[in-house]
């Protein structure tokens, strides 16, 4: 009986410690920190038809002393700016597909008293990479002279600390084209889409326009860190939306997307060496 009690007590302690680690206490966290880390990195992504959300995930000086600033969003938010047309190739003697990418507009909000949106600052961005199957896209801001003032922190790699089910999460986006606002819920489960790509299920409500925003957790590092990109909501019947059953593209898929498209430096990877051209000796 004593052995059973001891094992049971150890199990309780381990479980309790895990829950505390998953949801660290936020004592000492100020509203200013919550605004700067969750709200302010959000942008509105505007196209000629429709809009969605985006998140600034990188803004640093490059070797030419110009600012490289990148915004993460969903592919379906910017898909109308990707044009595929067929043209005749006299060289191949057949029709071939060509792709063109139109620039998109992004709006950053300005605030009074931390929370009151008073207007936006516009920027133009180019579509640098996209992945239909993962529903992710990366935009680069054309403005090279000014650094983006607020950048989201990505959830670190290689840490055995979640995200876990029951962890408190925050969804932030520009729903319906309005100034960004947060909703809170739990990480409820894991799933996959029809292509087998992993998804997070959360009870943080999202609505139309939240796509391309982000899902946050408060980490043991006492910062709010991005763990996913809200992508879709559950529905039943004829378009009956269940906003508190929200699906997000997880941070693991985001890392794969960035690395496959040679943007691993955003994750802190060392720059890949350029391939040397081999001269033809003949």
Regions of interest found by a model, annotated:
Residues 7-16:
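Bacterial N-terminal signal peptides
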Residues 60-68, 116-118, 194-196, 218-225, ...:
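Short, solvent-exposed loop/turn segments that connect beta-strands within catalytic domains
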Residues 30-31, 42-74, 241, 245:
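A conserved glycine-rich beta-strand in the N-terminal activation segment of trypsin-fold
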Residues 1-7:
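Positively charged n-region of N-terminal signal peptides that target proteins for export
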Residues 33-34, 52-55, 60-62, 82, ...:
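Active-site substrate-binding loop(s) of clan PA
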Residues 22-33, 82-113, 226-282:
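C-terminal cap/linker of serine protease catalytic domains
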Residues 55, 205-230:
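Catalytic nucleophile loop of clan PA
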Residues 126-130, 149-199, 206-212, 232-242:
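Flexible, gly/ser-rich surface segments that form the specificity/activation loops bordering the active-site cleft
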């Amino acid at each position: 009986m004593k052995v059973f009690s001891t094992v049971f007590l150890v199990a309780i302690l381990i479980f309790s410690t895990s829950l505390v680690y998953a949801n660290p206490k936020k004592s000492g966290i100020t509203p200013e920190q919550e605004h700067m880390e969750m709200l302010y990195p959000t942008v509105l992504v505007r196209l000629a038809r429709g809009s969605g959300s985006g998140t600034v995930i990188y803004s640093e000086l490059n070797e030419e002393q110009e600012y490289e600033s990148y915004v993460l969003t969903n592919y379906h938010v910017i898909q109308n700016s990707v044009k595929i047309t067929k043209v005749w190739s006299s060289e191949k003697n057949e029709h071939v597909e060509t792709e063109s990418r139109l620039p998109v507009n992004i709006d950053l909000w300005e605030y009074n008293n931390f929370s009151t949106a008073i207007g936006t600052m516009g920027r133009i961005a180019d579509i640098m990479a996209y992945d239909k199957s993962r529903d992710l896209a990366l935009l680069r801001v054309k403005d090279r002279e000014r650094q983006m003032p607020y950048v989201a922190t990505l959830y670190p790699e290689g840490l055995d600390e979640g995200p876990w089910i029951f962890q408190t999460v925050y969804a932030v986006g520009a729903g319906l084209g309005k100034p960004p606002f947060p909703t809170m819920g739990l990480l409820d489960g894991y799933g996959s889409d029809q292509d087998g790509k992993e998804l997070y299920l959360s009870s943080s409500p999202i609505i139309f326009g939240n796509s391309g925003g982000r899902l946050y957790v408060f980490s043991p590092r006492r910062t709010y860190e991005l763990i996913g990109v809200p992508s879709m909501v559950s529905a039943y019947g004829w378009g009956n939306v269940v906003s508190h059953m929200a699906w997000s593209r997880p941070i693991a898929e985001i890392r794969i997307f960035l690395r496959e498209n040679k943007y691993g430096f955003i994750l802190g990877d060392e720059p890949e060496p350029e391939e040397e051209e081999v001269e033809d000796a003949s």
